[in-house]
Amino acid sequence: EKGFPYYPTDTKWRNDIFNQLVNFKRDTLIDRKNKVIGQSAHGLNLAWSYMPHAWGIKCGKMKTPMEIWEDEEHLSKGLNKILSGTFFMKKPAHMITESDMRSMLRRYSGTQMVSNFRPTAAAAMYDIFVDKESPLEGTTAGTVWDPSMGYGGRLLGAIAAGVNYIGTDPCIPTYEGLEKIRDEYGHKHLN
């Protein structure tokens, strides 16, 4: 009825998610003693909102979420799993959200979706390993080079951490999404 449950693309939603990412306390993810950077999903949905084509990208021989969506039998089985509470939290039909649908399409048996780097983890790594702009310390923002940018997680992490980011990606629809992220949230280079 509504069409595929892509992530929202409206400016207010995106700006709210971006602000949550920027304001997230990344230092809570860093466990220096055990040399571990923890996980938080902040900003991941923002990255995905620029990559609608990702739902149809094949991972080996697995079905894509888009293939499940387009197959009435599989889609019906997935919906029944939500309605009955099998594998998913049980919900009546009128309570099923687009988020529930995305989750089901990702986790449906025999299905795999491409993955993304968590922006908070990327930003935490940049916080540790890359210089920041600081007139007080006399430093300028360092630069990260990403030879295979993926779906925007590391780019958003670089923006949140305030470091320069240079990247390449061979997939045209992916690169177009990355350019939109850069144009809408990236810092303008001053030189």
Locations of regions flagged by a protein language model:
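Class I S-adenosyl-L-methionine-dependent methyltransferase catalytic core
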Residues: 1-43, 52, 59-191
